[in-house]
Amino acid sequence: MALQVELIPTGEIIRVVHPHRPCKLALGSDGVRVTMESALTARDRVGVQDFVLLENFTSEAAFIENLRRRFRENLIYTYIGPVLVSVNPYRDLQIYSRQHMERYRGVSFYEVPPHLFAVADTVYRALRTERRDQAVMISGESGAGKTEATKRLLQFYAETCPAPERGGAVRDRLLQSNPVLEAFGNAKTLRNDNSSRFGKYMDVQFDFKGAPVGGHILSYLLEKSRVVHQNHGERNFHIFYQLLEGGEEETLRRLGLERNPQSYLYLVKGQCAKVSSINDKSDWKVVRKALTVIDFTEDEVEDLLSIVASVLHLGNTHFAADEESNAQVTTENQLKYLTRLLGVEGSTLREALTHRKIIAKGEELLSPLNLEQAAYARDALAKAVYSRTFTWLVAKINRSLASKDAESPSWRSTTVLGLLDIYGFEVFQHNSFEQFCINYCNEKLQQLFIELTLKSEQEEYEAEGIAWEPVQYFNNKIICDLVEEKFKGIISILDEECLRPGEATDLTFLEKLEDTIKQHPHFLTHKLADQRTRKSLDRGEFRLLHYAGEVTYNVTGFLDKNNDLLFRNLKETMCSSENPILGQCFDRSELSDKKRPETVATQFKMSLLELVEILKSKEPAYVRCIKPNDSKQPGRFDEVLIRHQVKYLGLMENLRVRRAGFAYRRKYEAFLQRYKSLCPETWPTWTGRPQDGVTVLVRHLGYKPEEYKMGRTKIFIRFPKTLFATEDALEIRRQSLATKIQATWRGFHCRQKFLRVKRSAICIQSWWRGTLGRRKAAKRKWAAQTIRRLIQGFILRHAPRCPENAFFVDHVRTSFLLNLRRQLPRNILDTSWPTPPPALREASELLRELCRKNMVWKYCRSISPEWKQQLQQKAVASEIFKGKKDNYPQSVPRLFISTRLGADEINPRVLQALGSEPIQYAVPVVKYDRKGYKPRSRQLLLTPNAVVIVEDAKVKQRIEYTNLTGISVSSLSDSLFVLHVQREDNKQKGDVVLQSDHVIETLTKTALSADRVNNININQGSITFAGGPGRDGIIDFTPGSELLITKAKNGHLAVVAPRLNSR
């Protein structure tokens, strides 16, 4: 049988049991899984599963080509050592099912193809076995699949981890926190329909049994400017559209909202309210359910939605200038809704939106705002309300996720697994303050990534006793220092500009940068650039040379966004809010605190430093996400875009670090188990230490000293070509081993089959001979007994039934009945019947009569009503004429028909004269006069009540059946007959003499219609009839050679008729 294999999206090579059936088996040493090395034979088609095995590992083109090959085969995961590289397929590959989770659960990292679940399981097992906190760092560009990867990790832990003792409440809250955070923190951008507009770090706490018992979420730098402004083709945060699309009518009415997003200023700027890939209505149902799961009360949900609605109403609040150019609120309806939703006084809110409170020398002064300032204050309030509500929402979720057993002694044994879903490096056509912060974050994480990767490599080498070799790589510390260094860094200069008195602007900030860090090799402005570079730099821009490439930032809005200014009277108004959530978001302590709050950049820098410390305290795992194209199309591989991401993710740096020492490393046990067949000394079993076996094996394979090193528990192979050569040799060895195994197996199988057949044949032959002997003896015994009984019965066959003749009598009876069954009569006319034995004569007669009745019954059931009527008439004709009328035998084979005249042959006047009386039978006849016997053509009609004689269109005579006394006919073959009527009937002139060509049929139907079957007289010689009052007529019948009807000299009607049948 030919071996058929197939590559599936997980990267596994599976054996197809039958090409036309869906049953498949994975190949591997354990019969279930394949190892990474098993896929090396297919490397020319699908690439290598670990970039470390690339021969030309320094070539970016080779790196991207390997990515392309795997992407083309729907293999979206590839390793760089322990780092997982994921390419977004933009479609569902069906590789995240429960079955896939079980495949990767509890399996060594390299025993299965690359997958997110392999990373998840490795991290989880390290968390449990080493009792050390872990962290999974997920990074990549917007739209690369970071949020989806985070959700898949949480799904894996929710499905595979043991349930806590108190049920799955924590597990459900961890999963349901995602839809809520996505609704309030994600939005549609040009690059991603579900882009996270904030950074997220989630800690999941596990007890000593490995069950999730709690969690905590940290959020970073929400893009709150999106609340008031979106670029073309982008949307605001999802929650606004979900509320409008999915909210109940009563809810929207209470919030003063309508369903059309085009009605709200904050939702129309991107001109992209509807997105085909987003179902806001169904997402709203998911969010509402999730809020319940994470312990939101109905009052809290109502307060939260009031805040969301208030942001929309703020966007629709408009101003107009009065005579002094001061702003005045013109949308009173919006103000009314805002007053109710925010829980503040209307007059206070109106004043706060149109005035600014200034404290000078201990005195409070109100300064009116112009239109531009009022719009700024309104937008600042909207951003502050939304961003602080988001912060409160994260804190609320954290309270829901907090473990309820934090005070118990077992709490000390908990471990933490961190999930970092942070925004990727961003380079847009116009880059502002948000991109500066995001890219600074990526610089810090890249610095941490290189440090931790080098550290883990060095620790492994030291643990294995391998000499550490220094690695050349780009250290981006110089860029991090450029941004964050005290006094000289960009953030310090930005803060200084924000805090200094006087007219500080974005351009003065840029000038300060040029004066302070103009000599830095990674910093450039229009003023500092050469003549050629100035063409690509405006005067209000500066350029940073990041590790991922150059990014040009526009300083417009830097100071404003860094200050994040909210006027004091707006804070005071919000602090007085009766909305419980806003009451927690705007604390009155802010009003009494005279200290200027930290700037946004400083807050972000401090939180980022804290995050770095958190990640350093944990054992890291990395998932690097790549977006294959900007159009979000499955199957499209944009090489330019991917090369850019490979660069800014530092994947080539990571690969160089990993390959600086050795490309491949494996435990001695695993290496020996896989390749032991290549050496006669280690095949088929090695009984010594695995390390000694590997030493013998590599010596036999001819490894050069510079190609490998032997550690304490692992073998290290420096070059991929060495591993490829070993793998190719293994493939050849497997072919020869397979041939040998097949030959041995075939011989063994055939011999075993022969021995089984031989044993079976002997057993069957022995059993069958015994069976035949027993059957033959039993048959002889039975035959002798039967013959003896038959002879005894034959001798006593005439005696009464007794035990001696009972068998013979029963046999005779049975034989007769069986023979009778084969010789039963086929029809009622068949009178044959087998001769019965004396003992069955009476039973035979009963059966014969029963059989005849049964045939008659079957025949009667089979005839139609018309045929039944025909037979009945024939039976009446037979009863009347059989043996009495000479021409009767000739009428027997002729069928009686219902009428001899069609409807068109009877004059309509006759039909009119009869009225509703139906005609049962009609026949043409010849009527003979009573005196001269002149023949006249007439029609005889039978109705239910009378015989009617018709001449053309006139009814000549009507004889009621009650007046019909009889019918006379001769015994010869003539066709004359006489209808006798009562002599007392004055309406009748006498009897009627008629001739019909169908005399038997006519007389039978007349007799049946008139009920005169017994009144038909068949006469010989002559018939006397009443010719009129007091006068009789005579018809004389004589046999002759031919039919002749004449008037005789004696005044009689003479009829000569031939004889048709001898009597």
From Swiss-Prot:
<dbReference type="GO" id="GO:0005902">
    <property type="term" value="C:microvillus"/>
</dbReference>
<comment type="similarity">
    <text>Belongs to the TRAFAC class myosin-kinesin ATPase superfamily. Myosin family.</text>
</comment>
<feature type="binding site">
    <location>
        <begin position="139"/>
        <end position="148"/>
    </location>
    <ligand>
        <name>ATP</name>
    </ligand>
</feature>
<dbReference type="InterPro" id="IPR010926">
    <property type="entry name" value="Myosin_TH1"/>
</dbReference>
<keyword id="KW-0597">Phosphoprotein</keyword>
<dbReference type="GO" id="GO:0060171">
    <property type="term" value="C:stereocilium membrane"/>
</dbReference>
<feature type="modified residue" description="Phosphoserine">
    <location>
        <position position="1041"/>
    </location>
</feature>
<feature type="modified residue" description="N6-acetyllysine">
    <location>
        <position position="486"/>
    </location>
</feature>
<dbReference type="GO" id="GO:0005516">
    <property type="term" value="F:calmodulin binding"/>
</dbReference>
<keyword id="KW-0007">Acetylation</keyword>
<dbReference type="GO" id="GO:0005938">
    <property type="term" value="C:cell cortex"/>
</dbReference>
<feature type="binding site">
    <location>
        <position position="88"/>
    </location>
    <ligand>
        <name>ATP</name>
    </ligand>
</feature>
<dbReference type="GO" id="GO:0005524">
    <property type="term" value="F:ATP binding"/>
</dbReference>
<dbReference type="InterPro" id="IPR036072">
    <property type="entry name" value="MYSc_Myo1"/>
</dbReference>
<dbReference type="GO" id="GO:0051015">
    <property type="term" value="F:actin filament binding"/>
</dbReference>
<dbReference type="InterPro" id="IPR036961">
    <property type="entry name" value="Kinesin_motor_dom_sf"/>
</dbReference>
<keyword id="KW-0505">Motor protein</keyword>
<feature type="modified residue" description="Phosphoserine">
    <location>
        <position position="408"/>
    </location>
</feature>
<comment type="subunit">
    <text>Interacts (via its IQ motifs) with CABP1 and CIB1; the interaction with CABP1 and CIB1 is calcium-dependent. Interacts (via tail domain) with PLEKHB1 (via PH domain); the interaction is not affected by the presence or absence of calcium and CALM. Interacts with POLR1A. Interacts with POLR2A. Component of the B-WICH complex, at least composed of SMARCA5/SNF2H, BAZ1B/WSTF, SF3B1, DEK, MYO1C, ERCC6, MYBBP1A and DDX21. Interacts (via its IQ motifs) with CALM; this precludes interaction with YWHAB. Interacts with YWHAB; this precludes interaction with CALM. Interacts with RPS6.</text>
</comment>
<dbReference type="GO" id="GO:0007015">
    <property type="term" value="P:actin filament organization"/>
</dbReference>
<keyword id="KW-0539">Nucleus</keyword>
<dbReference type="GO" id="GO:0000146">
    <property type="term" value="F:microfilament motor activity"/>
</dbReference>
<keyword id="KW-0112">Calmodulin-binding</keyword>
<keyword id="KW-0488">Methylation</keyword>
<keyword id="KW-0518">Myosin</keyword>
<dbReference type="GO" id="GO:0030048">
    <property type="term" value="P:actin filament-based movement"/>
</dbReference>
<keyword id="KW-1003">Cell membrane</keyword>
<feature type="domain" description="IQ 1">
    <location>
        <begin position="734"/>
        <end position="757"/>
    </location>
</feature>
<keyword id="KW-0966">Cell projection</keyword>
<keyword id="KW-0677">Repeat</keyword>
<feature type="domain" description="TH1">
    <location>
        <begin position="885"/>
        <end position="1059"/>
    </location>
</feature>
<feature type="domain" description="Myosin motor">
    <location>
        <begin position="47"/>
        <end position="731"/>
    </location>
</feature>
<dbReference type="Pfam" id="PF00612">
    <property type="entry name" value="IQ"/>
</dbReference>
<dbReference type="GO" id="GO:0016459">
    <property type="term" value="C:myosin complex"/>
</dbReference>
<keyword id="KW-0963">Cytoplasm</keyword>
<dbReference type="GO" id="GO:0032587">
    <property type="term" value="C:ruffle membrane"/>
</dbReference>
<comment type="function">
    <text>Isoform 3 is involved in regulation of transcription. Associated with transcriptional active ribosomal genes. Appears to cooperate with the WICH chromatin-remodeling complex to facilitate transcription. Necessary for the formation of the first phosphodiester bond during transcription initiation.</text>
</comment>
<protein>
    <recommendedName>
        <fullName>Unconventional myosin-Ic</fullName>
    </recommendedName>
</protein>
<dbReference type="GO" id="GO:0005737">
    <property type="term" value="C:cytoplasm"/>
</dbReference>
<feature type="binding site">
    <location>
        <position position="96"/>
    </location>
    <ligand>
        <name>ATP</name>
    </ligand>
</feature>
<dbReference type="GO" id="GO:0005886">
    <property type="term" value="C:plasma membrane"/>
</dbReference>
<feature type="region of interest" description="Actin-binding">
    <location>
        <begin position="608"/>
        <end position="630"/>
    </location>
</feature>
